[in-house]
């Protein structure tokens, strides 16, 4: 049975990375350093901009995070692709939360816009995922729009985030 709560702690997210949260057949989050959130604060099957599901998660920012030391030296900024990956991670996590089984793979994104940045002086990044559609057939797939905020200010948007769950990824 799926551990279906409305919120998850960092330890819960780490358990997902070990395959312990949604069972051995459920999708896993990546382990640190690629795990891009510290907690999920809200998950619902309704709500969001399309009333088809909503996820909100947070990442605490501090100057010691690994990417600030290498991107860029003397001009530290969180790579935008990590925020995009976090949104894909959350779409896959939601599919596992719904009971989907398989290995999660990002399948694409319609459009991404960056209108701000995450600097080491920031305190918190918030991710908001608004589900548009869930396909639950031979292929399990989530389609969603996402937003990234830093300290409450919208800085990235992504439309048509797609993640699928696969039983076999050898031909992918």
Curated annotation (Swiss-Prot):
Reactions the enzyme catalyzes: a (3R)-hydroxyacyl-[ACP] = a (2E)-enoyl-[ACP] + H2O; (3R)-hydroxydecanoyl-[ACP] = (2E)-decenoyl-[ACP] + H2O; (2E)-decenoyl-[ACP] = (3Z)-decenoyl-[ACP]
Active site (UniProt): 71
One Gene Ontology term of the molecular function aspect: (3R)-hydroxyacyl-[acyl-carrier-protein] dehydratase activity
EC number: 4.2.1.59, 5.3.3.14
InterPro entries, alphabetized: FabA, FabA_FabZ, HotDog_dom_sf
Primary localization class, coarse: cytoplasm
Subunit field text: Homodimer.
Record-given protein name: 3-hydroxydecanoyl-[acyl-carrier-protein] dehydratase
Phylogenetic classification of the source organism: Bacteria, Pseudomonadati, Pseudomonadota, Gammaproteobacteria, Enterobacterales
Encoding gene (name): fabA
């Amino acid at each position: 049975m799926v551990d279906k709560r409305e919120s998850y702690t960092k330890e819960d997210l780490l358990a997902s990375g070990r395959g312990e949260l949604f069972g051995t057949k459920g999708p896993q989050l990546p382990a640190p350093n690629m795990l891009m959130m510290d907690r999920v604060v809200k998950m619902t099957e309704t709500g969001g901009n399309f009333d088809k599901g909503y996820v909100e998660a947070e990442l605490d920012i501090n100057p010691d995070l690994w990417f600030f030391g290498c991107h860029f030296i003397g001009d530290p900024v969180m790579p935008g692709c990590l925020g995009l990956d976090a949104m894909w991670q959350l779409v896959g996590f939601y599919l596992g939360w719904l009971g989907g089984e398989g290995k999660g793979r990002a399948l694409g994104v319609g459009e991404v816009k960056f209108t701000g940045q995450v600097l080491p002086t920031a305190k918190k990044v918030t991710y908001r995922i608004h589900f548009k559609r869930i396909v639950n057939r031979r292929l399990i797939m989530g389609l969603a729009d996402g937003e990234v905020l830093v300290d409450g200010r919208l800085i990235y948007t992504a439309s048509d985030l797609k993640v699928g769950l696969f039983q076999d990824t050898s031909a992918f």
